[in-house]
């Protein structure tokens, strides 16, 4: 009633007039008499006769249909409130008719025609104060008589009533939870009107200037209006033909999905509004409030509710309700609560949301990753590498590979001005990177990769191409961008698992097909339900969501074509960088003297597009013998003693004899590995204390060079040493830019590409000018390759 009064739109003056009128005793007496006249049946009969006479003057024949009680159907409308359908009867309606016919399967039967009349829905209040809607559906008495004798015919009458109300008043009725009540009629009976045009009569048009003439509230039926109604009826019949058999068959009881709402609830905390970086209010709510509308339910005793993680399921047999909801956040099901509101027939479920601390999850993930990394390192050291006594390594598969030092040599250059050849003896203490045989590599990849792709369906790989893609990640998601143009969206097929993602597609106006299989480590799990693919003109974007137990930065992935060996790809992270640096220079295989002279490598920045490192020169102390210790004094400069000698042989010569005498302030680091005859020498940078410049020059003049001991050679060597010392003492700010550095990099006299090998039997020296080595990892940046 309150809503109807609001629709009146009364002004304040009109309300005052009504208030004063009802305060007058005479007005109240007249109002009571008017109400009694309306309720009098005789007065209502006269009222109907007068209305019929006025309608006949307009060319319309009307009949008042007074419904006779039959039985009542209970259901719900729009999933919100109860709905009652009064199945009534009246003699003014046509009798039911039937015709023999066959159904779609060719079975013989009867086609029934059931005329009916509908009345508009009206709201009423129940005993508990809840609102419900009432509709009247009127048939001929013979229709209800047959329905009382035949149960199948009654089901036809019920389904006809439900479809008529739903289509005529554009409402949604719950057909799965229809129940027949024991009462015969619900509410107060209200008559309805049948209006038909009179044949052979001309309607009288009132004078528009007459103050007593009122516009006709109903449309006069015409031929055009009749055609439109026929068209609408045909459209409705065609729509009914597309309805599935399960929806038309009343015997099949399908559970109804109730209406529900999910609300996010949070609490205001003043600590979240401090002037601090960690005081940002969290976007994750504290609680989730799920409200489920169950209008046909009297209590929550027959409801089964189950909550696990992000899934919420609700089931009820009588009435038949079934609801499966995927919540936006993981909730604590043990601390939730549910309440049933009988007045509104609603089930209110409140569950707290698990508040994930991203930093804690990332730290736990990194600790687990380090533990697994140490375990894999211990296993790989036993399974993959076994060294023999003669300096060779035998892999787990039985293949034997010779040791090759990890050395990068520069091309040999001649000093034309001085006629001298600069050479650098290589240090045998340089670390060795053990090779992995091809068989062993395949075995490990089969164990790691193929084990992850057992559930992925195999596809023909002869015509498939792996696309070029880039990947990025954050603690909760991973994004892949496949750089393929003009992808046909209709050709995309995907397969998602807990540890893999597979996509195949083809290109428009081309026969080429692309196939990409991405697999992850067993502890890196993705959520198969939260995957999206966005296709554009230039590429395809694939978004993967990490599971809550795998939140953090992942270490690596494997990619390739399905059915073929996959390639390993590591993410750019601090752990991966440290692991690469640790693997490239294992300290356990380097002598203590060499460890002191190892360069200090500092990675400033490393991304997929750019790598920035800093290599610091170590500060070492001069180690000399006892007979020359007195010559080492304080020295203000950091010098690098480079051995320069005059050679009488060309670059292509294979042997060269030299003296074994060395400088007092020079240290030759030698490593005899596995009792072999190979020896590599490299002069190290030294820092002498307590020695003046003049003393240093005097000592350098006493050096003995192989092949020539003249003063000319001594002075040339001294000049070369001083020049090298000055170049090494340049400050970092005085160094030239990268372009100048790369141009003059190969022209430095202190570097040489000569590699010497001393024979074990005759002591001959073999000069190797062309030398290739093996690198533990590939540099994407050319500067890193040059520095190596």
From Swiss-Prot:
What are the Polar residues biased-composition ranges? 417-427, 685-701, 744-754
One of this protein's Pfam families, by short name? Answer: PIH1_CS
Q: State the UniProt keywords alphabetically.
A: Cytoplasm
Positions of region (Disordered) = 194-249, 415-438, 628-754
Name the GO cellular-component terms.
Answer: cytoplasm; dynein axonemal particle; extracellular region
Q: Tell me the superkingdom of the source.
A: Eukaryota
Compartments in which it is found: Cytoplasm; Dynein axonemal particle
Q: Does the keyword Cytoplasm belong to this entry?
A: yes
What's a single GO BP term from this record? epithelial cilium movement involved in extracellular fluid movement
> Which residue stretches does the UniProt record annotate as biased composition, category Basic and acidic residues?
225-241, 628-644, 667-682
Function comment: Required for cytoplasmic pre-assembly of axonemal dyneins, thereby playing a central role in motility in cilia and flagella. Involved in pre-assembly of dynein arm complexes in the cytoplasm before intraflagellar transport loads them for the ciliary compartment.
Query: So what family is this one in?
Result: Belongs to the PIH1 family. Kintoun subfamily.
What is the protein name given in its UniProt record?
Protein kintoun
Which species expresses this protein natively?
Xenopus laevis
């Amino acid at each position: 009633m309150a809503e109807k009064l609001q629709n009146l739109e009364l002004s304040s003056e009109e309300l005052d007039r009504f208030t004063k009128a009802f305060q007058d005793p005479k007005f109240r007496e007249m109002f009571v008499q008017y109400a009694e006249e309306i309720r009098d049946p005789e007065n209502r009969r006269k009222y109907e006769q007068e209305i019929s006479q006025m309608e006949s003057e307009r060319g319309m024949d009307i009949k008042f249909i007074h419904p006779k009680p039959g039985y009542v159907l209970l259901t719900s409308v729009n999933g919100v409130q109860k709905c009652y359908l009064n199945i009534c009867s009246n003699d003014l309606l046509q009798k039911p008719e039937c015709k023999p016919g066959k159904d779609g399967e060719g079975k013989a039967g009867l086609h029934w025609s059931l005329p009916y009349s509908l009345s508009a829905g009206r709201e009423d209040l129940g005993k508990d104060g809840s609102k419900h809607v009432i509709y009247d559906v009127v048939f001929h008495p013979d229709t209800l008589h047959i329905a009382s004798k035949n149960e199948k015919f009654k089901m036809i009458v019920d389904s006809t009533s439900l479809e008529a109300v739903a289509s005529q008043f554009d409402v949604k009725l719950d057909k799965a939870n229809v129940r027949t009540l024991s009462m015969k009629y619900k509410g107060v009976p209200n008559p309805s009107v049948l209006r038909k045009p009179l044949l052979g009569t001309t309607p009288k048009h009132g004078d528009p200037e007459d103050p007593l003439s009122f516009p006709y509230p109903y449309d006069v039926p015409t031929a055009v209006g009749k055609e439109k109604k026929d068209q609408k009826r045909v459209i409705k019949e065609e729509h009914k033909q597309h309805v599935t058999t399960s929806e038309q068959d009343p015997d099949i009881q399908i559970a109804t999905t109730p209406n529900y709402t999910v609300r996010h609830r949070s609490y205001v905390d003043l600590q979240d509004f401090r002037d601090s970086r960690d005081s940002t209010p969290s976007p994750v709510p504290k609680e989730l409030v799920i409200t489920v509308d169950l209008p046909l339910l009297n209590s929550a005793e027959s409801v089964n509710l189950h909550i696990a993680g992000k899934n919420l399921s609700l089931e009820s047999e009588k009435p038949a309700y079934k609801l499966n909801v995927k919540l936006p956040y993981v909730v604590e099901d043990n601390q939730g609560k549910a309440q049933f509101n009988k007045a509104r027939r609603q089930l209110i479920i409140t569950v707290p949301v698990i508040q994930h601390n991203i930093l804690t999850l990332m730290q736990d993930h990194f600790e687990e990753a380090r533990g697994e990394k140490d375990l894999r390192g211990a296993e790989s050291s036993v399974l993959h590498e076994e060294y023999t006594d003669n300096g060779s390594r035998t892999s787990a598969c039985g293949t034997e590979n010779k040791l090759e030092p990890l050395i990068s040599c520069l091309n040999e250059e001649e000093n034309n001005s001085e006629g001298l050849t600069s050479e650098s003896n290589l240090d045998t203490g340089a670390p060795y990177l053990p090779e992995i045989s091809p068989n062993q590599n395949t075995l490990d990849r089969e164990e790691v990769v193929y084990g992850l792709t057992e559930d992925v369906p195999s596809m023909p790989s002869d015509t498939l191409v792996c696309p070029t893609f880039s990947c990025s990640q954050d603690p909760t998601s991973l994004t892949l961008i496949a750089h393929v143009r003009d992808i046909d969206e209709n050709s995309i097929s995907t397969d998602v698992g807990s540890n893999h993602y597979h996509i195949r597609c083809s290109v428009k106006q081309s026969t080429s097909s692309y196939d990409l299989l991405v697999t992850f480590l067993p502890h890196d799990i993705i959520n198969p339900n939260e995957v999206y693919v966005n296709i554009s003109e230039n590429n395809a974007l694939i978004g993967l969501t990490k599971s809550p137990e795998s939140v953090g930065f992942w270490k690596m992935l494997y990619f390739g074509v399905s059915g073929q060996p996959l390639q390993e790809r590591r993410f750019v992270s601090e752990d991966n960088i440290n692991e690469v640096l640790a693997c490239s220079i294992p300290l356990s295989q380097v002598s203590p003297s060499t460890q002191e002279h190892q360069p200090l490598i500092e990675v400033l920045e490393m991304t997929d597009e750019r790598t920035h490192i800093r290599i610091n020169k170590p500060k070492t102390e001069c180690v000399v013998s006892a007979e020359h210790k007195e010559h080492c004094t304080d020295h203000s400069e950091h010098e690098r003693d480079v051995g320069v000698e005059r050679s009488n042989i060309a670059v292509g010569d294979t042997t060269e004899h030299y003296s074994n005498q060395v400088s007092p302030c020079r240290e030759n680091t030698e490593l005899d590995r596995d009792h072999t005859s190979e020896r590599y020498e490299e002069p190290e940078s030294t820092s002498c204390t307590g020695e003046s410049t003049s003393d240093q020059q005097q000592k350098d003049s006493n050096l003995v060079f192989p092949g020539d001991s003249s003063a000319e050679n001594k002075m040339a060597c001294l000049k070369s040493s001083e020049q090298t010392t000055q170049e090494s003492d340049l400050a970092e700010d005085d160094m030239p830019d990268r372009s100048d550095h790369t141009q003059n990099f190969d022209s430095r006299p202190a570097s040489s590409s000569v590699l010497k090998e001393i024979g074990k039997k005759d002591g001959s020296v073999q000069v190797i000018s062309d030398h290739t080595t093996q690198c533990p990892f590939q540099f994407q940046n050319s500067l890193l390759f040059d520095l190596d």
